[in-house]
């Protein structure tokens, strides 16, 4: 049996989709459980079949899936897994989405557009999820899209602890890639010894439609070691441009830090050649450092394992990032 039994007979079971099984295995090791065996395959027309190899009746079930490319396939697989657990009489189902898909589509920018992030929450609830766990949501209001508990975890302590251990904080400036991330940058600055802050001012290109251009730095970065942060990096164009602007403003060095390394092409090429000393991310999505010498990947599994443990034991998830009940 892969379950973790307690005296009250509540049963913790961990399940993993096929997108990032290494992450689930790391979480399982920290929890001292095994990932529940599952049969999953694709039919010729692209439909997905899943079946669990053990009874889930009465279990406290945690379903981990990373939403990397092909994102829609892995989202559908997680929904099918949740539905199978619901129909198998699981007691409670927690959907763990380290990277919340469609998070950038959290509101209507123009008429006749969907609010895709809300739809994802509705799909998870309809499938049978009782609770959602995610890490560094693109916007906080996504928590309100799901009609149930949402545990919004933060990778900042993981990233800042690494920076504290490796870099001299006396010369650091925390830089937000735009004005919208300044509040997050403030938290980073407080954690990194009340470091000074700056942000990159962006305007829309007058030459290319729908393109945003980083054009100047607000704040003093001359001679400083800059920590340029964001919640996610996709193609890397904005961040690479920000590195260039910081260098032009006299920054001595630039370190990029993000929770979610989506790294769609041509991100690797851009970020490895933009002049950044290091790119730091976590493994909320599958990562490979092969051919990318300045990429550092930090494990998110310990945070997820502690979160699962607190939920299972009816503890306080808040203590994991605030330090008190």
From Swiss-Prot:
NCBIfam families listed in its UniProt record: PRK01259.1 (NF002320), PRK03092.1 (NF002844), ribP_PPkin (TIGR01251)
Encoding gene per record: prs
A GO CC term assigned to this protein in UniProt: ribose phosphate diphosphokinase complex
Annotated Mg(2+) 2 binding sites: 178
Assembly notes: Homohexamer.
UniProt binding sites for D-ribose 5-phosphate: 204, 230, 234-238
Residues annotated as catalytic: 202
The protein, known as: Ribose-phosphate pyrophosphokinase
GO molecular function, one term: ribose phosphate diphosphokinase activity
Catalytic reactions on record: D-ribose 5-phosphate + ATP = 5-phospho-alpha-D-ribose 1-diphosphate + AMP + H(+)
Purpose of the protein: Involved in the biosynthesis of the central metabolite phospho-alpha-D-ribosyl-1-pyrophosphate (PRPP) via the transfer of pyrophosphoryl group from ATP to 1-hydroxyl of ribose-5-phosphate (Rib-5-P).
Family in the record: Belongs to the ribose-phosphate pyrophosphokinase family. Class I subfamily.
Source organism: Corynebacterium efficiens (strain DSM 44549 / YS-314 / AJ 12310 / JCM 11189 / NBRC 100395)
Cofactor note: Binds 2 Mg(2+) ions per subunit.
InterPro entries associated with the record: PRib_PP_synth_CS (IPR000842), Pribosyltran_N (IPR029099), PRibTrfase_dom (IPR000836), PRTase-like (IPR029057), Rib-P_diPkinase (IPR005946), Rib-P_diPkinase_bac (IPR037515)
EC numbers: 2.7.6.1
UniProt pathway: Metabolic intermediate biosynthesis; 5-phospho-alpha-D-ribose 1-diphosphate biosynthesis; 5-phospho-alpha-D-ribose 1-diphosphate from D-ribose 5-phosphate (route I): step 1/1
Keywords: ATP-binding, Cytoplasm, Kinase, Magnesium, Metal-binding, Nucleotide biosynthesis, Nucleotide-binding, Transferase
Cofactor(s), names only, from the UniProt record: Mg(2+)
Binding residues for ATP: 45-47, 104-105
Coiled-coil features, chain-numbered ranges: none
Domain of life of the organism encoding this protein: Bacteria
Biological process terms in GO annotation: 5-phosphoribose 1-diphosphate biosynthetic process; purine nucleotide biosynthetic process; ribonucleoside monophosphate biosynthetic process
Signal sequence range: none
């Amino acid at each position: 049996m892969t379950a973790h039994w307690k005296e009250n007979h509540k049963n913790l079971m961990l399940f993993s989709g096929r997108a990032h099984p290494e992450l689930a295995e790391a979480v399982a090791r920290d929890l001292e459980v095994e990932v529940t065996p599952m049969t999953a395959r694709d039919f010729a027309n692209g439909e997905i079949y899943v079946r669990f190899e053990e009874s889930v009746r009465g279990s406290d079930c945690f379903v981990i899936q990373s939403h990397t490319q092909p994102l829609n396939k892995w989202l559908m697989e997680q929904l099918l897994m949740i539905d199978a657990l619901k129909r198998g009489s699981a007691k409670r189902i927690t959907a763990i989405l380290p990277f919340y898909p469609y998070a950038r589509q959290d509101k209507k920018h123009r008429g006749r557009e969907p609010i895709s992030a809300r739809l994802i929450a509705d799909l998870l609830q309809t499938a049978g999820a009782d609770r959602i766990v995610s890490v560094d949501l693109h916007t906080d209001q996504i928590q309100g899209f799901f009609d149930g508990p949402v545990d919004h975890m933060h990778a900042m302590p993981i990233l800042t602890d690494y920076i504290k251990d490796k870099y001299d904080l006396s010369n650091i400036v925390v830089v937000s890639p735009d004005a919208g991330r300044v509040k997050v940058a403030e938290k980073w600055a407080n954690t990194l010894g009340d470091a000074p802050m700056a942000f990159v001012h962006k305007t829309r290109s007058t030459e290319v439609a729908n393109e945003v251009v980083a054009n100047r730095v607000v704040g003093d970065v001359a001679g400083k070691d800059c920590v340029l942060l964001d919640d996610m990096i996709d193609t890397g164009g904005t961040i690479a441009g920000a590195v260039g602007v910081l260098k032009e403003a006299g920054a001595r060095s630039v370190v990029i830090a993000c929770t979610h390394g989506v790294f769609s092409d041509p991100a690797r090429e851009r970020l490895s050649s933009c002049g950044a000393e290091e790119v730091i991310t976590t493994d909320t999505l599958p990562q490979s450092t092969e051919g990318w010498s300045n990429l550092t990947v930090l494990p998110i599994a310990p945070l997820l394992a502690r979160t699962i443990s607190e939920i299972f034991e009816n503890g306080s998830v808040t203590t994991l990032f605030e330090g008190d009940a």
